[in-house]
Every structure is written in structure tokens, then in C-alpha cells.
Design a protein with these regions (language model features):
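HhH-family (HhH-GPD) DNA N-glycosylase catalytic core used in base-excision repair
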Residues: 3-186
Length: 186
């Protein structure tokens, strides 16, 4: 009994520390918080989650660069994406071609469907949410897809850690001071 109480107390302390608006400014969740329309929020969150590994200071710097390239309009950026706009943008394993590969797949998704929410909701309805999402990206990746692409879109079939995709999903479905809670299918 006391072990459970200690754990609950420790969790309560963490909630008080991190479940606050002040937490947003130093976290990748700051990027989807900058937008009002649902599709821009989900795209900003997805893009931020792709790059959220390594040094927090470094990936936030790179995300700021990327959102500058997107002129702070993620939906317009993706719907009209052309690889040349990336120039030499990269982050760790992710090279310009890797980002272009992902953004071209997102372009197809947003120009032919309702976007990420529809894709995740379909996967959820099939009880294979992450597998469906990953399969969508992998089935559309060209033969040019390299290590960086697979680093950003890990494969749960091969034991790939889905930590960043879970973080993105949490931002989209959970309501709170930090999480946006714009998806209701779960």
C-alpha cells in the first residue's frame, strides 16, 4: 500500500511540474500551439515529433529553422511542397531527401484525404493504429528513402520505438494545459 502511495505522490509531483502552460515554451509541443486551425496544428505536431530526439536545444533550433522555411504555414507548406524549398536543411540522420520524402507523402495525404486524423482514426478502427500509419508512409516511400526517413518514421513491425509517435498522438487526443486534444476518435 505505501509503495503505491509513494508512486502516486511522485506522479502527482511530476504532474504539477510538467502539466503547466509554462512547460510549453521549452518543449516541442510549442510548435502545434502556435496555430489555430486543426490541420496546421496536427501537421506542426507531427513535424515537431519527427525531429524531437537528441538535444532539446538543438532540435528546437532546427524546428524553428524548418518552420521559418514553411513561412509558419504548415498546411500551405505541405499542400504546395516542393523539395527544393528545403535547400540543405537537415537534422542528425535526417537529410534533405529524407524530409522531402516524408513531406511529399504528407502532401499526397492532405491533397487526397482529410489528413493525419483520418489516417490515425482508420488505423485505430482496425486496432492497428501505428502499423497502418507506418504502412501508409512505407508503401509510398520511393527507393531513395534512406536511414533518416526510417529514423523519423520507425517501424513497429521490426521493434521500432514509437515514443515520438505516441507523444504526437498524446498531443492530439489528450486535453490539458500542454496537450491540445483536437482529435476525438479515441
Amino acid at each position: 500500500y505505501s509503495i503505491v502511495m509513494i508512486t502516486k505522490n511522485e506522479l502527482d509531483v511530476l504532474v504539477e511540474k510538467y502539466e503547466t502552460v509554462d512547460f510549453i515554451k521549452d518543449d516541442p509541443v510549442q510548435f502545434p500551439h502556435k496555430f489555430k486551425d486543426k490541420k496546421s496544428i496536427e501537421l506542426a505536431g507531427f513535424i515537431a515529433s519527427l525531429v524531437a530526439y537528441g538535444s532539446r536545444q538543438q532540435f528546437i533550433k532546427k524546428l524553428n529553422e524548418l518552420f521559418d522555411l514553411a513561412e509558419h504555414e504548415p498546411l500551405n507548406f505541405i499542400q504546395n511542397f516542393e523539395p527544393k524549398i528545403l535547400g540543405d536543411f537537415n537534422y542528425r540522420f535526417g537529410k534533405p531527401d529524407d524530409f522531402a520524402e516524408i513531406f511529399l507523402i504528407l502532401k499526397e495525404l492532405y491533397n487526397t484525404s482529410d489528413g493525419l486524423e483520418e489516417l490515425f482514426a482508420y488505423g485505430f478502427s482496425q486496432e492497428k493504429m501505428f502499423e497502418c500509419v507506418v504502412d501508409y508512409f512505407y508503401s509510398r516511400a520511393s527507393e531513395k528513402a534512406k536511414q533518416g526517413f526510417y529514423q523519423m518514421i520507425p517501424n513497429p513491425h521490426n521493434g521500432g520505438a514509437m515514443k515520438r509517435m505516441c507523444m504526437f498522438l498524446r498531443w492530439m487526443v489528450r486535453k490539458g494545459p500542454v496537450d491540445l486534444g483536437i482529435w476525438n476518435f479515441i
